[in-house]
């Protein structure tokens, strides 16, 4: 009989202590900001040394997906209505809140014929949970894949919520 009493007492003690632990209010976890999500960008062609904009900035939308892919859309001067959105990949880089991405978009002439591509390589730094800046290199290729020219870019962005 004593053994049964001890077992019941131990079982009741475990149930009571487990209930207390499960019901205790826990503070919410502090989530480290990440680049994942939708961003409203302002992009410009920039001086490669100073990062200063050389032309009027243009708006863009970028989405960084949790699987390391990204999609973006902008329509800078000189592009046509048949150009594709940007598609690419992103990754975390060493250091606090540093990322990089590489993407591509295709260009088509007014007749719908493929005329080349543009590739963006960017280094991104989250300046807060809801903003980032980037330094970009843009390469433009003809339809045969020959490099036509490169230039630098700069962007600032805010998270779309």
Give the predicted meaning of each segment.
Residues 52-98, 106, 131-132:
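N-terminal glycine/threonine-rich, aromatic-flanked beta-hairpin/loop signature
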Residues 1-9:
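Bacterial N-terminal signal peptides that target proteins for export
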Residues 21-23:
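Boundary at the C-terminal end of the N-terminal hydrophobic targeting segment
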Residues 138-161:
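Edge beta-strand at a domain terminus
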Residues 99-133:
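Acidic, glycine-rich flexible loop segments
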Residues 41-47, 67-76, 101-108, 135-141:
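Generic short beta-strand segments
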Residues 31-53, 88:
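Tryptophan-anchored aromatic micro-motifs
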Residues 9-19:
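Bacterial N-terminal signal peptides
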């Amino acid at each position: 009989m004593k053994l049964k009493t001890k077992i019941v007492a131990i079982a009741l003690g475990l149930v009571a202590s487990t209930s207390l632990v499960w019901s205790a209010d826990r503070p919410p976890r502090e989530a480290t900001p990440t680049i994942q999500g939708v961003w409203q960008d302002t992009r410009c062609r920039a001086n490669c040394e100073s990062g200063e904009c050389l032309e009027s900035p243009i708006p863009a939308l970028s989405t960084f997906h949790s699987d390391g892919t990204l999609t973006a859309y902008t329509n800078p001067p000189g592009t046509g209505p048949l150009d594709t959105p940007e598609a690419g990949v992103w990754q975390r880089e060493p250091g606090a809140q540093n990322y990089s991405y590489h993407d591509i978009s295709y260009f088509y002439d007014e007749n719908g014929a493929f005329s080349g591509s543009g590739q963006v390589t960017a280094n991104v730094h989250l300046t807060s949970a809801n903003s980032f800046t980037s330094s970009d290199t843009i390469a433009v290729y003809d339809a045969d894949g020959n490099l036509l020219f490169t230039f630098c870019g700069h962007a600032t962005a805010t998270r779309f919520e």
